Amino acid sequence: MLFRSSGRIVDTIPIAVTKDLMLLGRTKFEVYCAICHGLVGDGVSLVATQMSLRPPPNLHQIRNPGPGHVFQVITEGFGLMPSYAPQLSAHERWAVVAYLQALRRSQAGTLADAPPDIQQKLRAEVPR
């Protein structure tokens, strides 16, 4: 479960992305990442307001972070962010990567991006 293959950072998640993996990723993100990056990854959190030197980035504004790059940052740390390898197994780190990909898509998505049956359900549930 390395983030590098033949010296290159991998561009796909090397394990099956399942609902259980996504739920694990969400749980671990909420415990270890959201405290600084915010629950939706926008860099808005109570801790971030106290970080005068350099606040955590809005994860949605980072240009095309491939899965291997995100895994590497979680594993090794970056800037003021420490490594989370001691707290998260490789499987859990890939789960966070998978969840972050879904989170990014959810924040940039529109109703038209959802399948027709989901669009219909959302239109019925959301008041206008």
Regions found by a protein language model. Name each.
Residues L24, N58, H69:
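Amphipathic alpha-helical recognition patches that constitute DNA-binding helices
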Residues G7-R8, E30, L39-D42, L46-V47, ...:
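Flexible coil segments in periplasmic/lumen-exposed cytochrome c-class electron-transfer proteins
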Residues R4, R8-D11, A34, T49, ...:
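Amphipathic, alpha-helical segments enriched in basic
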Residues M1-K28, Q120-R128:
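Electrostatic cytochrome c docking/interface patches
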Residues K19-D42, T75-E76, V96:
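Sequence/structural segment immediately N-terminal to covalent heme-attachment motifs in c-type
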Residues I62-G77:
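Short Fe-S-cluster ligation motifs
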